[in-house]
């Protein structure tokens, strides 16, 4: 179909599916031509101010995709024009040139080569730009033969590439999911669905409105579809802010639940969706919007999608975005993977296994039975070192068949995808023997289910093994991938083709001999076909009148000829080669059909392989790092014996540092709230985080870094640890802290686990102390959850006398020769000092600053802080001169600290040792004075 005034029935604009007039391009340094209006599309004069037929075609395609940057295929390049060229040149840092003129101005143009376009495409997608790929739908030479020399090649959009619909390995992280999500609000119900187009996994979940943010934080989707009204809801502005650039608003009509239900039922061939789960209207609308959008971007095609799964409310441990960041579950605060919990525990050997592990870490379970089943699978392999090693060796390097299957279903797969599926399926018998025949008894249900999913695929493996050659091209159109002997007809055509090539070589030798030009060559290109090439200085020999050589082309240093004999031979070769390639394409289509006919079974096998990989990886981690199996039940216990921080422990080991100090944590019913005090750098934040991470690991189904752990299921995990401002939204560090604390106090339940660090810092001392005090009381009296609260406000320890479930604990230190040694041990009690000046000294503050700080601290510790601060200010000439003193009463001097210390001593009741200690204390007081 030629694009002029008409357009493809499959091509619809992405933004509401209604064409809009493209915006004018940005300045390029000189006046750039704006796109012509559709009124000139049929004017083919090509004069300045009008458009050529080719440009008319471009503008028709662009008008159908106004919100996409258009990759317009021209030969070996994807070209961009007008405002697209300006945007692409700026984003990709490539040269901006021009092609023709319109309305008295140059038309901006830039391009990227076809053979390396994936890298440029990836950069555009990361910049939040959607790209429509417009391909040539016919051979240019064929177009000229059929419709004349000036014929415009037929082009059509074959795909719209967006951040949530990627399928190519070059554009994806093999070890991470790439989700396309949809969020819908229908009346008072909120539903969310998500799909990984590269694997076909499709899931839906009902949500409370307050859980939209945590759910999106859990998925970290590449793209989110939302009704325009919901996307613009001021109440969701804060929730959606982290997803800026990834929201795709669509008209409300795309989220009609009744149309969606019919669409989904038709797609999966069922009369009702009840068999997949009790989906609500909002969930069905979200699923339907996803399917419609995927079909739109794939221009009428759909990947193989699994039947939708339903994730019920309360099925997973809810963790909000702030907590995920603070705990660095999947990436560090700096945005990198290294140093995160995921990087620490990821010992998987396949891409699918890595994705499943990340999925489980992001969404820990809340059902003790399901958690126990996962732990059984890990435990089975922990105790079987040889089986575990052989299992991992067999899985290592196993191809990613889920993504290969998705590409084949979209018509974008190649011979290597077929080979990948055959290779992975061929390993299944060995894996089954390893697990079942290991002599370890009946495998637990988790591993048994994985083995059932693996299935049996001997017939398909045999077919692919017989059909595919060892050395495979990337694309089927390149040919040469069918193994010799698989198809007799193909073998015959290849023999004819290869014989023709041998005849070409003989003809070249004969012509070189007859003309006495040893350098004469017979070459081939896509324009001239086969031709004879000689140096320009020897061309006269071939141009003799009456000779067999016919001139074809003159270049700067070569001249090209043909002969009738060569042309006839070329026709024979081309015929055989074309027929061989056509037959090979037909065989490829047949093989694809065979594979896609088994798509559901192959998808289950992919899931089984991933489950085995995750179980073996977690078992290997547990055995190597001395992790223990946790007990997870429906109680409210939280009892960790000798727990360790998994990431910090590994970092210390990598740096050959000291061994990590393990600590206990028991949030028993009579001490559900721990108030943790201790010096700076003693390890309070590490202790808080390690207990939260142990809880996450336990509920995802992993062994944990501890000697033992007993955890009653946690429904929500909250963390307020670390300090960071949010200047983009006008938030100070203190404001960010208060927002996160408010979320905790408003959303935590009795089953939640809360860790809070330094609540109240960043404002006046008494303000901060008051907020921290009230927060502790609220956690104790109102929320009644399990909580760890770290603070430097030592005054809070007084709450232990009246809050019966609050227990004070501290990080121990040892003072030795004016030095402070951090023991990193947690024990009962309360700290009386924070040793901040000591930490400042370690940080390298100037000696004069340290000395003055010690002097100020001594004065402040003597009595009332406000009067001490006044005295300190009076010591400074500026303040002393500025503050009038006349008429102000002078407060009576207080008792001298040394006199107070002496008055407190009763020598008659002291042992010799106590007397000696008292003398040392008096000397210390004298030094301070």
From Swiss-Prot:
It comes from the Bacteria. ATP binds at residues 678-685. Disulfide bonds: none annotated. The keyword Nucleotide-binding applies. Residues 23-32 have a biased composition (Low complexity). Belongs to the DNA mismatch repair MutS family. This is DNA mismatch repair protein MutS. It comes from Rhodospirillum rubrum (strain ATCC 11170 / ATH 1.1.1 / DSM 467 / LMG 4362 / NCIMB 8255 / S1). The gene is mutS.
